[in-house]
Amino acid sequence: AILDGNDNVVASAPTASGKTALAELAICRCLRDDGTALFIAPMRALTNEKEAEWDRFEELGYSVYVVTGERDLNPRRAERADILVMTPEKTDSATRKHDSPRYSFITDVDCVIVDEVHLLDSDGRGGVLEATISRLRRLCDPRIVALSATMPNIEDVAGWLDAPPESTFEFGEEYRPVDLHSDVRTYSHGDNAFADKYRRLYAALDIAEPHIREDGQALVFVSSRQDAMRAASKSRDEIAERDIPMGARGDYDFHNDAKELS
């Protein structure tokens, strides 16, 4: 449906089950027809990641250009790009200013891949994303490929995007490459909220330790960017204190630039 058709597509699939491959198939179809593809990534950090990851398109003679608020826009490069990578907010801004020569490139997009389309349901950013997609459809009527790991209302999204049933896919947990096991752990709660954060972090590290020792990875969610930086620093110290080897993955840098993390 993605490579051989032109219909809009909505796909929901578990994390790491191949959504990036679906995006790349849509891009390949667009490039095959000499079109311009736009990939809308939810965060600036992911736009940088895609730029590095899609070097292989450059090797095939196609140009990839990232447009974000933290970079100086080169309108000529944007106009000549085969693949554009942008955040929802920057795409929103470009579509609002499409009449200006600086942002006229946005009206030449033939295919839009929306990553993490479930953000439509979020406060603030959801409204921006919805308005941006609607504006794009009015400006240049591109093919829309909407991807998400969690989309409970996939039929509603498909209906809004005019994606037919044969181009609407919902893959269950059986497609997850790694089994997901759920568990609830408790920790002792004290009177000091600051100390409680570290109690929770140590409990999380206790769970993660055996996986890290086997050269695995762990992802710890905290409530804010500031807490993320503190937890990362404390985790590094605690892991060193526990003598857990981590050198196999190379250097460990903290990406603490607010623009990079937003």
Where are these regions (language model features)?
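Conserved Walker A/P-loop ATP-binding site and its immediately adjacent core
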Residues: 20-21, 35-56, 90-92, 149-154, ...
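SF2 helicase catalytic motif II
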Residues: 84, 88-92, 99-144
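Conserved motor-coupling elements within RecA-like helicase/translocase cores
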Residues: 71-85, 262
